[in-house]
Amino acid sequence: MSERTSADDGAIEAILDTLARTAPEIRAGLVGRREYVEAANPSGEDQLAADVHADQLLEDRLLAIGDVGTYVSEERPDTIEAEDGGDLSVAVDPLDGSSNIKPNNTMGTIVGVYDTPLPARGRDLVAGVYVLLGPITTIVAAVDGTVTEYVVDDGDRHTAREDVSLPDEPTVYGFGGRVPDWTAEFTEYAREIESDTSLKLRYGGAMIGDVNQVMTYGGVFAYPTLESAPEGKLRLQFEANPMGYIVESAGGKSSDGERSLLGVEPDDLHDRVPVYLGNAGLIDRLEAAVDGGK
């Protein structure tokens, strides 16, 4: 993981404050923006009006921070450069889980702060952040190997928990993708997890909410390799790297099935990757199960 400078410290604080101020606007903007627009993002997914609105807000606000030089979004094909920006690059999933807007379930924003041009490895992150729009709005930020949870109230952030770590005794799991599309190796692993009576299924259709369950209760989240998508479904720069950075900073592990997500070398801004996150023992078992099929 990248070493921070004193300039980075101030920039990260500014980014967190900006995300706190913007979160109420993103939440308020969901009302009346539940319909699809006639456009798709670079991954081929139909865009909701809420996706576009959140993306525009975040671009405007984050690029206004002097130390941020580049804005990259899951919703856009290319990077956006600030006219007089600094050396930090932000990679954003503006509204992770936006398909949950129709049933009014959890969603939020994922942000990776890199100190190098994108695409980049997760090892080049200086911060990983997610903003959870649940019954209350919270921010979970990993900075310099330490995870802090904030509660957002009227655009201000207040520390709720410091030195957040995954509980030693995991109790939840959540697996994405259609079950018939899982590989034989992952299916076997999933059946072992399901047979463990100490673990309960918690899957809500938004990575941000499902990983927050793991951060709160301990466990494992997976959006695995699929027969129809061997490269995985989640985006490395915008989702996998920041969330992997947070989970690892909280004492857990991340994996693409072979190695830490933070060590995956990207080829493109919108690369996809299998994602496995959680307590170390559960991820070790996953890697052993997946490797056994090779």
Residue ranges and their predicted role:
Residues 29, 35-36, 41-62:
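N-terminal, Lys/Arg-enriched amphipathic/low-complexity engagement segments
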